[in-house]
Amino acid sequence: MDKKTQALVGQYARSLVEVAFEQDAVSTIQEEVRQILTVFAETNLKTFLSQVNVTSEAKKESLSFFQESCSVYMNNFLEVISLNDRANILYDVLKLVLELFDQEDNTYDVTVTSASPLSEEQKTRLLTIVSQKFEIKTRRLVEKIDEELIGGFVIKAKNKFVDTSIRSQLQAFKMNLK
C-alpha cells in the first residue's frame, strides 16, 4: 500500500473511532466492524471491492447489505465510503479501526504458538502472566500449534514477541558454535 493510500486509510479509520468515542458507541461499532471483517474473511468481498472493472454502483449495493443491520454511525460511515468511491480500502480501514480501539483501551489478543496444545489451566496462567508482564488487558488467547518448535512456546501481543521455544534455543546455540 502506498503512502497516499495509507494516509487515507488512517484518516477514515480515525474518523470512525472519533465518532465511536464521541457518541459513546465504541462497543457497538467494534462489534459491527468485527462482523463486517468476518464477512470479508468468509467471502471474496475484499477482492470484489478492489476490482477496478466493478462499477461504483455495484460496490455501493454490496455495502448496502451491511447497512441493513448496522447502527446509524456505521451506516453513515459506509455511506461516506460509498459516496467517495473508497470501497476498495474498506477492509484496511476496518482493520485499522480495531487496532486503534485496541490502542485506546490497551486491550490486545495474545497469540501463543506451541508444539502441543495447552491445557485450560496453562492458558489461564499464560494470559495472567502476559497481562502483567506486557502491561496490557488481554481480550482472548489465539492458540497455534507448530510441532517444529519441539517444545516451549512463542508469545505475540501488542507488538511484543517472546520466544522460549527449544527450536530457537537450538538455533542460538548453533550460531554460538560458529
UniProtKB/Swiss-Prot annotation:
One Pfam family recorded for the sequence: OSCP
Listed GO CC annotations: plasma membrane; proton-transporting ATP synthase complex
GO MF entries: proton-transporting ATP synthase activity, rotational mechanism
Transmembrane helix among keywords: no
Tagged with keyword Membrane: yes
InterPro entries xref list: ATP_synth_OSCP/delta_N_sf, ATPase_OSCP/dsu
Keyword entries, A-Z: ATP synthesis, Cell membrane, CF(1), Hydrogen ion transport, Ion transport, Membrane, Transport
Topology within the bilayer: Peripheral membrane protein
Subcellular localization: Cell membrane
Membership in a protein family: Belongs to the ATPase delta chain family.
Function: F(1)F(0) ATP synthase produces ATP from ADP in the presence of a proton or sodium gradient. F-type ATPases consist of two structural domains, F(1) containing the extramembraneous catalytic core and F(0) containing the membrane proton channel, linked together by a central stalk and a peripheral stalk. During catalysis, ATP synthesis in the catalytic domain of F(1) is coupled via a rotary mechanism of the central stalk subunits to proton translocation.
Quaternary structure annotation from Swiss-Prot or TrEMBL: F-type ATPases have 2 components, F(1) - the catalytic core - and F(0) - the membrane proton channel. F(1) has five subunits: alpha(3), beta(3), gamma(1), delta(1), epsilon(1). F(0) has three main subunits: a(1), b(2) and c(10-14). The alpha and beta chains form an alternating ring which encloses part of the gamma chain. F(1) is attached to F(0) by a central stalk formed by the gamma and epsilon chains, while a peripheral stalk is formed by the delta and b chains.
NCBIfam families: ATP_synt_delta (TIGR01145), PRK05758.2-1 (NF004401)
Record-given protein name: ATP synthase subunit delta
Organism: Streptococcus thermophilus (strain CNRZ 1066)
